[in-house]
A protein has these predicted regions:
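Sec-dependent signal peptide recognition
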Residues: 3-8
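Hydrophobic h-region of N-terminal signal peptides that target proteins for export
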Residues: 11-18
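Right-handed parallel beta-helix/beta-solenoid
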Residues: 20-31, 92-134
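Detector for repetitive beta-architecture
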Residues: 29-31, 35-37, 43, 48, ...
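Extracellular beta-strand-rich solenoid/capping regions of secreted or surface-exposed proteins
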Residues: 34, 44-56, 64-81, 112-119, ...
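Feature marks extracellular polysaccharide-active and adherence modules
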Residues: 41, 60, 72, 102, ...
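Short glycine/acidic-rich loop motifs that flank beta-strands on beta-rich extracellular proteins
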Residues: 66-70, 164-173, 192-200, 214-223, ...
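Extracellular/surface-exposed low-complexity segments
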Residues: 87-96, 630-646
Length: 646
């Protein structure tokens, strides 16, 4: 046993001696031109340093300062988080290395300060909390040259890093760290103001990161408008005037109007962007998890918007999981990508939670939860590329649209599914949409997709009376917004509940309470709607407008109830083809006491069977229907149980 131990010790000593023989202690900056393993024990200063391809450099007390390092497949070994590349750039690439941001001179000293008596109009807080620290712009630009082209690198930020606003960046406040053509990069554990742009990269993991803005979260005021910036407005009683003398009191279309752009709101640009540089390149294998994004224009972007999508490569194979988002100017998650999974993400205070845009297909959003939204999620494609938007779905998610995010002169929508591949169905399953408004708005399923299908969903609409006595309203609409090649788009609501709640009390000759339009056709010519359950409570007026321009409506095995609706009596302003089966209608209809308004068309077809109606319904149709086009079977008054045949 003792001899064996001596043998092992001798072998280990031999290996160490051989390794020592291979490792060269660097004497000067020009002594590393051959391939080898180099130990740097002192500071090396030079404008250019050539290191043999495939070499390894080990820092052991020294560092490199002010040099452009030329090396391919360079392995870097650092013992700790000290600065070893001081103002250096790499021409080449590194491999199989484990590095920290501080190895490149980045200072992890970002901190939060307070400024009292912040007088910006409309802000709910009087004290501004803003971030400051050492400007790491130059150091980050250097480290980006090391990560670009790298393979098998573990990169740890290990701290909070400030980056100053760059005047040349205009509205996009901080600079980006641009990393190109890297493979197998793991980036983790840090807080940044700067955004990161990955171009033509593969197998990228970003985890346990925080991407923040120049200010801590605050509810920035109205920042979008569809009007002209030349006129003054009021939002919640606060006056906003035309910007003069460099003041920033106005929102000009999408971008904040002021001398420093979005800096005045404390917003930073996108957190992370994954993109391509040409049609021949790709960005694949993306994994973003356990990250937080706040006070950004956007959070995670998979592929940037283009004027010509034929000039881009593919962004594909992305997972965004267990991430949180707060206070975004546009979308927490936006994409022009394929084969994407978004899972267990949450956020608040944003224009729109998720944008599944042009070129996006095979996208699954599951377990998303967002509140304080102005819009719901969106699938939308440029018409010329509609055939590349397909097989997208949202599951087990919830979205609350409550207009805390002010947009002047614009309506909201619950879901925008504009354009998609003909024959494809955009599916929303096991999800809840909540809509709150005390002003006006449209809870819209806005579609030009060939088919949109809601399964086991809940659509909740809550209307509040305004303090000035005027009437808020909601239009529950399914309509075509853009020209489409699909000839008969269809919206299906399967086992889906609709709840509309208001504070109803009507007075003679005047309607001063919330009212709702249901399924109104706004520009739509052909539609199919299949409804499960709809409950309307406390509204002074209801117009259920399934217009004749809609091709087909099917209501089956449903519970339809309307309460406190004293103005309008039609349940259904019928489409060309109406089928009602196994359905119960409850609630007082009011003025007209009629279930269906017969359309003024020649080739309509209506069928009502195995259905019960409220006692207030005296007849099914406003005019005697043409029996050649109408079938009534087993329709009864739910109170008297008597049949209704006309």
């Amino acid at each position: 046993m003792t001899k064996r131990l001596y043998f092992l010790l001798a072998l280990l000593l031999c290996i160490c001696t051989m390794d020592a023989a291979k490792t060269t202690v660097v004497k000067n900056a020009s002594s590393m031109t051959r391939t080898g393993t180099y130990r740097i024990t002192k500071e090396l200063k030079a404008n250019n340093i050539k290191i043999g391809d495939g070499s390894t450099i080990i820092f052991a007390g020294g560092r490199i300062t002010g040099a452009t390092i030329k090396a391919r497949n360079l392995k870097v070994v650092v013992p700790d988080g000290k600065t070893y590349f001081n103002g250096c750039r790499l021409s080449g690439n590194i491999v199989n290395s484990k590095l920290k941001a501080t190895n490149f001179g980045c200072k992890a000293d970002m901190r939060t300060l307070s400024k009292s008596n912040w007088t910006y109009k409309g802000m709910p807080r009087q004290t501004l909390k803003y971030r400051t620290g050492t400007d790491n712009f130059k150091a980050m630009a250097c480290l980006a040259t090391f990560l670009s082209g790298s393979t098998n690198v573990d990169f740890e930020w290990n701290g909070s890093f400030f980056t100053a606003h760059q005047p040349s960046a205009a509205i996009y406040a901080p600079p980006f760290i641009r990393i190109e053509s890297c493979k197998n990069l793991a980036m983790h554990d840090g807080t940044l103001i700067s955004g990161i742009r990955f171009i033509d990269c593969s197998n990228i993991e970003v985890s346990d990161m925080r991407f923040v803005g120049y200010h801590e979260c605050h509810d920035f005021p109205a920042i979008h408008t569809s009007g002209s910036p030349a006129k003054a407005i009021k939002v919640n009683g606060v006056a906003y005037s035309v910007a003069r003398g460099g003041k920033y009191e106005w929102a000009n279309n999408c971008y904040y109007y002021g001398t420093d752009g979005t800096k005045d709101l404390g917003l930073a640009a996108e957190g992370i962007i994954f993109d391509t540089s040409s049609p021949k390149t790709s960005c694949t294998g993306i994994n973003v998890h356990d990250c937080h994004f706040e006070m950004r224009l956007n959070g995670v972007v998979l592929g940037m918007k283009r004027t010509n999508y034929n000039q881009v490569g593919k962004v594909s194979g992305a997972k965004i999981t267990n991430c949180t988002f707060s206070h975004h100017y546009f979308q927490p998650i936006g994409m022009h990508a394929e084969n994407v999974v978004v899972e267990n993400v949450s956020g608040d205070y944003a224009l729109q939670p998720i944008d599944i845009s042009t070129l996006s297909h095979n996208v699954v959003v599951c377990g998303a939860s967002f509140t304080d939204l102005f819009y719901g999620p969106k699938q939308e494609a440029e018409p010329a590329y509609a055939s590349q938007s397909y097989n997208n779905r949202i599951e087990n998610s919830s979205f609350t649209i409550n207009r805390k995010y002010h947009l002047i002169g614009m309506d909201s929508y619950a879901l925008n599914a504009a354009e998609g591949k003909v024959g494809d169905t955009f599916i929303v399953k096991n999800s809840t949409f909540n809509f709150f408004t005390d002003t006006y708005g449209t809870f819209v399923v806005r579609t030009c997709a060939d088919r949109v299908r809601f399964e086991n969903c809940k659509l909740n609409i809550n209307l509040k009376k305004q303090t000035d006595g005027s009437s808020p309203y909601c239009i529950m609409s399914i309509f075509a917004a853009l020209a489409t090649k699909a000839t008969s788009p269809k919206v299906e609501l399967v086992n889906t509940d609709i709840e509309i709640n208001g504070a109803a009390s009507s007075s003679a000759g005047r309607i001063s309470n919330p009212f709702a339009y249901l399924f109104s056709k706004i520009g739509a010519k052909f539609y199919s709607v299949s409804l499960n359950q709809c409950n309307i409570h406390g509204t002074a007026r209801v117009d259920w407008s399934l217009f004749e321009q809609m091709e087909s409506v099917s209501i089956s095995n449903s519970q339809i109830s309307i309460g406190g609706c004293d103005y309008h009596g039609y349940y259904i302003n019928a489409p060309k083809r109406l089928q009602i089966t196994g359905t119960t209608f409850t609630g007082r209809l009011g003025k007209y006491n009629t279930l269906v308004s017969v359309p003024n068309v020649k080739d309509y077809s209506h069928s009502i069977d195995n259905t019960t109606v409220d006692a207030s319904v005296s007849k099914l149709f406003t005019t005697s229907p043409d029996r050649r086009h109408t079938r009534i079977t087993n329709v009864r008054n739910r109170t008297t149980n008597r049949p209704i045949t006309k």
